[in-house]
Curated annotation (Swiss-Prot):
GO MF term set: ATP binding; ATP hydrolysis activity; proton-transporting ATP synthase activity, rotational mechanism
Residues in the signal sequence: none
Family: Belongs to the ATPase alpha/beta chains family.
Protein's organism: Rhodococcus jostii (strain RHA1)
The gene coding this protein: atpD
Primary localization class, coarse: membrane
Name of the protein: ATP synthase subunit beta
Superkingdom, natural source: Bacteria
Subcellular location: Cell membrane
Keyword Ribosomal protein: no
Sorted UniProt keywords: ATP synthesis, ATP-binding, Cell membrane, CF(1), Hydrogen ion transport, Ion transport, Membrane, Nucleotide-binding, Translocase, Transport
Length: 483
């Protein structure tokens, strides 16, 4: 093996100090360096390996100093073909990724390599992925609602501009579809820049997302960064930081409001757990890494608003076995401004988005921020739905006939509200054949207020299913009556 390795990741000159591999355990590689030339933590190292008919450069990230001139590193690529004695060079800086307009419309990996147009961005400005969060005096104190046009979200769990939103749910309840819908709406309605981080999810989903965004004409305003589930844990652990670094450039240098989508933040935690075990750390509760809270905090604290600019983050969070006490989702809760829980029972009823209106929360749902009228209507909707939930056991055992008359009226109203909370999505048009609806917040508040007051109790329940506004409900009711 050659002693010199050409640096190809990051801008600027590296230190090019040569070490050698002394131990390889899967993705964990121990490297020995000359005395006095030990690389810093998080530095990127390069090792050249030769496989049959192909030579490639491995990127290793320094994770621990072991003493005796040894460092323990985590490989960002499979270590097939890496042997003891292989020469390793220190780049002198962390993993760096391209930033700026050059990343829009392209797909990158965690190392900043462009996958759809190789070489894109490597000649321009690059930032290291390990960065400090904004100083306290730079943070934005003003609270502003991010209007999405999705009724259940805008009314019951309003998103804060520059905040962190969690999409909780088990497998197959619609987290990725809701993220795709938000990307489409932000690009179409607000002409905003989006950065998408695919963390440990299916490669097929990443391909589908790229093709759909290209088809809908929103790809040119979006940067995609993928570290999929077939890649080593080091890549899956760092891909969210790579995407966040690109988003920080748009916020701090270009002064833009940016949306950062992370799918799935649980895979970030899962990758950290794998790396922690490989590094020999003692596991904590349920086998997770002892540094879980610290790693989550380092990521989440960088996602914030500075004066006049913001990064709003929408994070899909897989809940293992639908257990919300699991340390991974529980640790994430502490950082979120709003939580949108996607419910399997609601999904099975055919109501989409399958948002649970009683368990989803938002810290800005208070009169001083959203206004007294919005607050009153949201609480009335929740009151009716909560009462309906309490009556369901009685209905299941004794039937509707045993309810008092006022409870029968409330149940009918609750079912209409429940169905009206769903609506057609733009990204689902080709599956449903129905156009997606965007409902202004003002219209949403008025519509739910009128339904709560009983103005539409005479219309059939099915007329409220997947409708946008009240005009759609009345049109559906006429269609049903015509049959």
């Amino acid at each position: 093996m050659t002693a010199a390795v050409t640096e190809n990741n990051g801008a600027g000159s590296g230190s090019s100090v040569a070490g050698r591999v002394v131990r390889v355990i899967g993705p964990v590689v121990d490297v020995e360096f000359p005395r006095g030339a030990i690389p810093e933590l998080f530095n990127a190292l390069h090792a050249e390996i030769t496989l049959p008919s192909v030579a490639k450069t491995l990127t290793l990230e320094v994770a621990q100093h072991l003493g005796d001139n040894l460092v323990r590193t985590v490989s960002m690529q499979p270590t097939d073909g890496l042997i003891r004695g292989t020469s390793v060079s220190d780049t002198g800086k962390p993993i760096s990724v391209p930033v700026g307009d050059v990343v829009k419309g392209h797909v990158f990996n965690a190392l900043g390599d462009c996958l759809d147009a190789p070489g894109t961005g490597r000649d321009g400005e690059q930032w290291g992925i390990h960065r400090k969060p904004p100083a306290f005096d730079q943070l934005e104190g003003k609270t502003e609602i991010l209007e999405t046009g999705i009724k259940v979200i805008d009314l019951l769990t309003p998103y804060v501009k520059g905040g962190k939103i969690g999409l909780f749910g088990g497998a197959g309840v619609g987290k990725t579809v809701l993220i795709q819908e938000m990307i489409t709406r932000i690009a179409r309605e607000f002409s905003g820049t989006s950065v998408f981080a695919g963390v440990g999810e299916r490669t097929r989903e990443g391909t589908d997302l790229h093709l759909e965004m290209e088809e809908m004409g929103v790809l040119q305003d979006t940067a995609l960064v993928f570290g999929q589930m077939d890649e080593p844990p080091g890549t899956r652990m760092r891909v969210a930081l790579s995407a966040l670094t690109m988003a920080e450039y748009f916020r701090d240098v270009q002064g833009q409001d940016v949306l950062l989508f992370i799918d799935n933040i649980f895979r970030f935690t899962q990758a950290g757990s794998e790396v922690s075990t490989l590094l020999g750390r003692m596991p904590s509760a349920v086998g997770y890494q002892p540094t879980l809270a610290d790693e989550m905090g380092e990521l989440q604290e960088r996602i914030t608003s500075t004066r006049g600019r913001s990064i709003t983050s929408l994070q899909a969070i897989y809940v293992p076995a639908d257990d919300y006490t699991d340390p991974a989702p529980a640790t994430t809760f502490a950082h979120l401004d709003a939580t949108t829980e996607l419910s399997r029972p609601i999904s099975q009823m055919g109501i989409y988005p399958a948002v649970d209106p009683l368990t989803s929360t938002s810290r800005i749902l208070e009169p001083g921020i959203v206004g007294a009228e919005h607050f009153r209507v949201a609480n009335e909707v929740k009151r009716i739905l909560q009462k309906y939930k309490e009556l369901q056991d009685i209905i299941a055992i004794l039937g509707m006939d045993e309810l008092q008359e006022e409870d029968k009226v409330l149940v009918g109203r609750a079912r209409r509200l429940q169905k009206f909370l769903g609506q057609n999505f733009i990204v689902a048009e080709k599956f449903t054949g129905e156009p997606g609806s965007v409902v202004p917040l003002r219209d949403t508040i008025e519509a739910f207020d009128r339904i709560c007051k009983g103005e539409f109790d005479h219309l059939p329940e099915q007329a409220f299913n997947s409708c946008g506004g009240l005009d759609d409900v009345e049109a559906a009711a006429k269609k049903i009556a015509g049959k």
